[in-house]
Design a protein with these regions (language model features):
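Conserved alpha/beta-hydrolase "acid-adjacent" motif
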Residues: 96, 100-106
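Short beta-strand/loop motif that positions the catalytic acidic residue
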Residues: 87, 93-95
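Catalytic active-site module of serine/aspartate enzymes centered on a nucleophile-bearing elbow/loop
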Residues: 114-138
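Flexible "cap/lid" loop of the alpha/beta hydrolase fold
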Residues: 2-34, 72-74, 128-131
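Helix-rich cap/lid subdomain of alpha/beta-hydrolase
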Residues: 16-59
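Active-site-adjacent alpha-helix of alpha/beta-hydrolase-fold enzymes
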Residues: 105-115
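Hydrophobic, aromatic-rich cap/lid helix
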Residues: 56-82, 86-88
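Short coil/turn segments at beta-strand junctions that form active-site/ligand-binding loops
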Residues: 5, 89-90
Length: 138
């Protein structure tokens, strides 16, 4: 197997917990503090803008213990906030403008208008495509 020919960032940023370039820190903290089935269901719903795609996802939704997910979210927050700035390794940046997790505005602020491709997609656009190549070709 050869080296990767491209590295694509999709629906996120190098600053995942950041008021201007990711998720606002206070919103993320509130999500961790109040995390439970209702918060998770809201998160899943916000990944989509098409109820049919949400239903498709929910039909095979991940089944993990709530306490495990909450611990993972808290550990992720701690790691992100303690980390040094990350080097941009991506050759392609796709901003999802209908994203209700990472707003399109924050994604554009993070990547820059001149370096990102903007698509009117939700946070989880995968059900709209046959495969990864189909998504990259859109």
């Amino acid at each position: 197997a050869g080296a990767f020919v491209s590295r694509t960032a999709l629906a996120g940023t190098l600053s995942p917990i950041d008021a201007g370039r990711g998720l606002p820190p206070d919103s993320y903290a509130a999500m961790v503090e109040t995390f439970g089935p209702e918060v998770l269901d809201t998160f899943y719903a916000n990944m989509f803008d098409d109820p049919t795609q949400l239903d498709r996802f929910l039909a095979s939704r991940p089944r993990r213990p709530m306490d495990e997910l909450r611990e993972e979210m808290a550990a992720f927050r701690a790691a992100v906030l303690a980390a040094a700035p990350v080097r941009d390794i991506y050759t392609k940046k796709i901003v999802t403008s209908r994203d209700r997790i990472f707003t399109g505005r924050n994604q554009l602020r993070a990547w820059g208008r001149d370096t990102a491709t903007v698509h009117a997609w939700p946070h989880f656009p995968f059900f709209q495509f046959v495969d990864w190549q189909d998504l990259l070709s859109a």
